Every structure is written in C-alpha cells, then in structure tokens.
C-alpha cells in the first residue's frame, strides 16, 4: 500500500506529541549498499511547512523519502514526530505516496478509501472530497488493475492527504496529472499545510512555488 501500516491501537499505541516537530533531520550522508549517494544539511520541519527536495536525477531524493517513511535504513538521527522512522508511532504520523503507488487488487478505488479511513479511525469524508476534486467520482467503483497509472496515483493521493496526518511524503506527485488535477492537488496541499500538516515533496517543476516551500538540496557524495 502507498500508505504506512495501520496506526497502532490499544496498549501498543503511542501518539505523536504535537509539541514535537513533524520531522528532524541531522546532517546526513545517504548510502545505498554501503556506497555514499548524497549528503544533505540537517533541518527541522515545523507544522505547516512544505519542504521541496531538490537535486539531480539519481542523487537520492526517493531514497531519502523511503528512509523517512521507514522503508529503508540509513536515517541515523532522523526523527519523525520525535520517533525513529519505521517505529509504530512514526508510522502512525506519516503518509507516503511513491511515484507508482500500488493499490490492493481486491478493493475498488472507493472501497480502498473507505478501508483506509476505517483502518486509521479517521472520517472518510476528507478522502472522498479530495477524490472528487481530483475527478475520481466516476472511477470509485472500478478495480485498481483497470485504472490508468495516473488515476491510481490520484486514489493514493486522496487517501494520503485525506488522512490529515502530521507528515506527508510525496514523490513526484504532479508527474501523471493533468492541469485541473494539478491545481486541485496543489490546493489540497495548501490546505493541509494551513491546517498544520508538514509535507516533504519531490518535483522537477515549479508547481510548489505558490506554497513558498523551504528547499533542501541533496548534493552528490
């Protein structure tokens, strides 16, 4: 799934402390199979801030997002809402959409949105509202394998942003979208930031300019 594992419940649950920043990055060298890939300067991302990851192709932007999502090691000292990436409380605070987000084959697009909201104990209305803004209403009863890559991406983006979690990670979210959908996505990101959510986004274009993002440049190691 493009989203993190279900939020822990009961005695296993440790909610993110709203007083802690959504993301704390130390000075870091990203490595793949032990090979240095990129270096970056540390920063603290506060609620409501948008961070644009910048750098040439292959420098490690997607690798960094995977580290932040807890899918890949290499983030010594990184903290998500005060916790180590991949830990239960960090995953409970993070939504993540890669460039080609997989969806479960046994749920229609609409069922996936309802299932995701229920799994996270969140209202489904924000997910469905964003889906409508992205032009998905006619596709909600369709199986993912029958959807185009761009439409699947819209479903994943609707789920991730609709959950309204403290930290949202988006890898090239505009790449497969038409102009109207890009505008709707930008509006959703702007509203998420205005509500206190932090976003980390990779994009090769200038789509994020209206959000006045901070920029983190990854330099080849």
Q: PLM features: residue spans?
A:
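The feature captures the beta-strand-to-loop junction immediately N-terminal to the Walker
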Residues: 54-56
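Helix-to-loop junction immediately C-terminal to a conserved catalytic motif
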Residues: 69
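Hydrophobic anchor residue at the start of the ABC signature
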Residues: 157
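Conserved ABC transporter NBD signature motif
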Residues: 73-92
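Conserved ABC ATPase "signature" region
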Residues: 114, 124-140
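Conserved ABC ATPase signature
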Residues: 143-150
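Q-loop/switch helix immediately C-terminal to the Walker
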Residues: 100, 105-121
